[in-house]
Structure formats: C-alpha cells, structure tokens
A protein has these predicted regions:
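Structural signature of tandem alpha-helical TPR/SEL1-like repeats
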Residues: 50-57, 84-92, 134-145, 169-181, ...
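Terminal, low-structured helical/coil segments at or just beyond the last alpha-helical repeat
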Residues: 22, 27, 195-222
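N-terminal leader/linker segments that initiate helical-solenoid repeat arrays
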Residues: 16-73, 91, 100-102
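Canonical positions in the second alpha-helix
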Residues: 62, 95-96, 148-149, 181-182, ...
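Short coil turns that delineate tetratricopeptide repeat
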Residues: 67, 101, 154, 187, ...
Length: 222
C-alpha cells in the first residue's frame, strides 16, 4: 500500500512540475511584473527591472537543459532589450548564430518546429531588436546590433540598410556605400530607395534626390 501511495505521489509531482521548455517559458512569463511610473505630465506602466532579471535567470536555467531551443534564446534577446542591455543581447545573438551555423539540425522553435531558413530568422529578429533601440533613440545600442547583424549577414538588405542608418545618424557619407549595395541586391526595396533619396537630399544633390524620389513614387506608392 505504501509503495502504491509513493508511486501516485511521484506521478502527481511529475505532472505538476513537468520539466519541459514550455513549462520554463511559462515560469519566466509569470515572473514578469509591471509597475506604475509617474512623471511630471503622465502616468504609465512599465516592466519592473527586478522581474525582468528574474525572468532572464529562469530562461538561463531553461537553456542549460534545452540548449537547442532557439525561441528561448530569442526570449533572452527580447528580455534584455526591455532592460536596454544590448551587450547581453549581442552575446545571445552570438550564441544563436553559432548554434544555427554548427548545430542547425538540432535547433528547434516552439512545438519542435525546425528552422528552414536560419538567415531569414536571424535577419527578422535582429531587425526587431535593433528597431526597438532606434525608436528609443538609443543610438549606441542600435549601432552595436546593426554591426553584428552585418557581420553575420553581409548580403542582407536589412543589415546593409541598418548600417546605412547608423552612418546617416552620424552624418557620415559612407551611408551611400551600404545603400547602393542594398539597392543592387533588391532594387525594389522601398525603405532603401527612400533612404537613398534622403541621403542625396541632405547632400544637396537635387538631381539624384529627384531621381530616387520618382523611383519611390513609381515602385512604392502604387
């Protein structure tokens, strides 16, 4: 009778504390809390730093057990973006890139989904992470991720455009080098065309500005 009771309790324990990637993700999500912040003219809610750090620690533990779950690595990128810790984001992106390059057959997303196009996945996640810093006018973090993105994806239009934005923000003429390469790779990319037009507008080159403004009107505003 005692053995049966122990077996039942063990089964219940296993069911309650199932050690799966999804269970770890749920724990991390539950750890995240919001707090009310007040300024001189507004009241708003924001994730508390302590809870984000707790969630990140939970995901680190999950990755020790499930190192090939790329969605958990990407969760760390997102959490550290909320904490504006771009150095940590860069470290996690480095690991993701390494895994996708050397162990792609073992890597998975949610539900065991395999990764068909690793470059496309990286491009999309880098773009989201970098854009978050751009929107917050955190130029140093934006530049860090843009440079890393280009290092890993040298022929990505998104990466080339991101680096052009870094140079545009610095009023550096090298921006056009990245824009021209991106335009050559994808002549119909509307963001690239717009940025080329903007570059020539800043340089006072009316002829080139009008040329690319017309291209933008023809290709992008149909």
């Amino acid at each position: 009778m005692k053995k049966i009771l122990v077996a039942i309790l063990a089964a219940l324990f296993t069911q309650t504390f199932a050690d799966t990637p999804e269970e770890w993700i749920t724990r991390a999500n539950k750890a995240i809390k919001t707090e009310i912040r007040a300024s001189s003219n507004s009241i708003h809610s924001k994730y508390s730093l302590g809870s984000l750090q707790d969630a990140s620690a939970i995901l680190d533990s999950a990755l020790e057990r499930f190192p090939y779950r790329i969605d958990i690595w990407l969760g760390q990128v997102q959490l550290n973006g909320e904490m504006e810790n771009c150095k940590a984001q860069a470290r996690y992106f480095e690991k993701i890139h390494e895994l996708l390059k050397t162990k792609k057959d073992k890597c998975e997303l949610k539900g065991g989904q395999k990764i068909a196009d690793a470059d496309k996945l990286l491009e999309g996640e880098f773009t989201i992470a970098a854009r978050q810093h751009f929107d917050k006018e955190n130029d140093a973090c934006y530049e860090m991720l843009a440079r890393q993105m280009l290092k890993f994806l040298p022929n990505s239009v998104e990466a080339l455009n991101a680096m052009s934005v870094v140079h545009l923000l610095q009023k550096n003429d090298s921006a056009i080098v990245y824009l021209e390469k991106a335009h050559k790779l994808n002549p119909s990319d509307c963001i690239v065309i717009h940025n080329i037009a903007e570059f020539y507008k800043r340089k006072g080159n009316q002829k080139k500005h009008e040329e690319y403004t017309m291209k933008e009107a023809l290709i992008c505003k149909q």
